[in-house]
Amino acid sequence: LVVYLFFASGINHFAKLPILTNNVKDISKISNESLKDKITILGFFGKNIEDRYGDAGNLNQEIFKRFNEFKDFQFVMIQPKETKFLSDNLIKEMNRLTKTDFKNWKFVEMSDEDLVGVFNSLQTDLKLDANLGTSYVFIIDRMGNLRGRDDKEGAKFGYDSRFVADINNNMVDDVKVILAEYRMALKKNNVYK
C-alpha cells in the first residue's frame, strides 16, 4: 500500500544534476548554432577527427540512440576550421556502420581562438590536446550552463567518450536526470496542456 501511495502521488523527488559552470560561452554569435534552449552534448573532436571514430561510435550507441527522439536534444561538436571534410567523412562512416540518422549531430567550425574560448568558458580541470580536441564531452543545459557531478569523489565536468564504462555508469544517468528536470519544468509551466 505504501509503495502504491508513493507512486500514485505523482510527486517525484530526484537529485538534480548540479550546475558546475554558469553561462558557457554561447556559440550563436560566431556560428549558426546555439547552446541555448536545447540540452546539448558538447564535444571537441579536434583536427585529428579520424582518431575519434571510436569515441563517436560510443556516444552514438550509448547516448544518441537512447535520447535522440527528444526534440530539444542535440550533439554539438566544435571543430577547428578546415575540418568539414573530416566531419562529413565521420558522419558518412557512422551512417554506413550504424544506420543512424545524425540530423541532431552538428559540427561547427570556428577559429582556433574562438574554439579555445568556448572550451575555456567551461572552466574545467581538463585540457585540449595539441590538435584542439579532447575525448571528453560535456552536458550543457538549455540555459547554457555546464552540468555534471559534484560529490565525494570531486567534480566531474565531463565524460570520457573513449570508455563505454564512463558513459554507461555516469553519463547515461546524468542525461536521464537532466531530461527529467527539463520535462518537469515543462510540465510545471503547463507546456503540455
PLM feature spans:
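Sec/Tat-exported extracytoplasmic proteins
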Residues: 63-67, 122, 126, 175, ...
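Structural microenvironment flanking redox-active thiols in thiol-disulfide oxidoreductases
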Residues: 55-107, 112-118
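N-terminal targeting signals for export/organelle localization
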Residues: 1-28
